[in-house]
């Protein structure tokens, strides 16, 4: 975020209503009775000759309307309710045809560029830098806060959210699509909620909660990477500033304070209620969405755009769980980056020696699974002790964005160090939604997990400015180093003593005649060899 590129936020809301957008769950053009009944979401780019004449920008070679490809490989046994959830084989319960864009073109109608590209022909590379929030200037910090606040209040220009399941999507009369408008930031919250919500099994039946399309499996990192990328691109469009980038919060401080919880950043603690945000912060005005879980689970409805109570936050305030009163240590990150396998069977929250499970926080920083442990990402969420510590609500607290950009930075560093080895990302038998080729729920257009399993600077148009901690040695490693050093010292002393003895012997020989009967003739030793060309070593 360069200061000279800042825009006045007060003058850009109206133009947003007609700006192009890429990241809708379902584009507004597809939220119609006809599109839903036909199962086709291939909007026109420039329909100069009438509707349906330029689907997916086909007239200019940007894309084409194709059948959706959905992963059908088996998932793990954690989910036993096949056929009962709209998120299965995403997004085929709603649409079975969508745009497939060519080259670097992207978007619901192939009207924009893939991440990392810009220009009318999407042939110009672009690279933005995600920096440490605390390293930003006062002007840059204020710009970020105001941009987030604007995203919270600005209706998304291109998409709507479903408020009913697929069997009820056309309403009681069969002709009233059940969609609502929602703000840019609240859509960011909604997508997260939709990925973690329970499976509704029917009236009078308890909803199934052991399902999660974005956590506790290999897709944790790829899903949240795209989630952030979506928000960043949405905000770039909103600000009309392609250089805008999301900073990160380096939560690995080992401290029991939240160093970004100040009124010029994410908001300090309220003087009137320690679980609320200070009135001096704009975030005290924010109201959460997707909090009516009981209604969703018993009535089978979905989260809508209705806002509820304020953000709750009480960093290090959970006195009942001392383990979550202090943030991860810098060395935890260093140790995590030494776990060389991306994921390991059963590809779940009990995997051991799994980098994914380690950075997610279900294993200790060395990769060893321990059911009592909460580390790194999980620990940072729980430390916030409020809205940010509840999975379905956590993105309502804007700290979520900064926490996950740092988690993504760790992921990208791991990809760089280990050359993005996809062989440890399971092709099948991961929890539902977590197979390598699964379309991540509920993103649109469909995008697979493996498409995000790439180094960001080379493939996604962003990089991180971060210094990684070096790893301290453990006690056992220090003992090993000490033993090796001692043995090396003994070897040096022995070698020195041998040299002194040899030198004294050579000095005595120097006083003897050059040729005597005891002289070892070279020819005689050579003749003793069976093969003169064979080494004696």
Swiss-Prot record:
Pathway assigned in UniProt: Pigment biosynthesis; melanin biosynthesis
Signal keyword on record: yes
Topology versus the membrane: Single-pass type I membrane protein
Keyword DNA-binding recorded: no
Family stated for the protein in its record: Belongs to the tyrosinase family.
Regulation: The activity depends critically on the nature of the bound metal ion. Catalyzes the oxidation of 5,6-dihydroxyindole-2-carboxylic acid (DHICA) in the presence of bound Cu(2+) ions, but lacks activity in the presence of bound Zn(2+) ions.
GO MF annotation list: metal ion binding; monooxygenase activity
Bound cofactor: record note: Contains bound zinc ions after heterologous expression in insect cells, giving rise to a protein that lacks DHICA oxidase activity.
UniProt cross-references to PANTHER family, sorted A to Z: 5,6-DIHYDROXYINDOLE-2-CARBOXYLIC ACID OXIDASE, TYROSINASE FAMILY MEMBER
GO biological process entries: melanin biosynthetic process; melanocyte differentiation; melanosome organization
Cofactor(s) for this UniProt protein: Cu(2+); Zn(2+)
Designated name of the protein: 5,6-dihydroxyindole-2-carboxylic acid oxidase
Transmembrane segments: 481-501
Top EC category: oxidoreductase
GO cellular component, one term: melanosome membrane
Purpose: Plays a role in melanin biosynthesis. Catalyzes the oxidation of 5,6-dihydroxyindole-2-carboxylic acid (DHICA) into indole-5,6-quinone-2-carboxylic acid in the presence of bound Cu(2+) ions, but not in the presence of Zn(2+). May regulate or influence the type of melanin synthesized. Also to a lower extent, capable of hydroxylating tyrosine and producing melanin.
Sequence ranges on the Cytoplasmic membrane side: 502-537
Compartment(s) where it occurs, according to its Swiss-Prot or TrEMBL record: Melanosome membrane
Keywords: Copper, Disulfide bond, Glycoprotein, Melanin biosynthesis, Membrane, Metal-binding, Monooxygenase, Oxidoreductase, Signal, Transmembrane, Transmembrane helix, Zinc
Glycosylated residue positions: 96, 104, 181, 304, 350, 385, 472
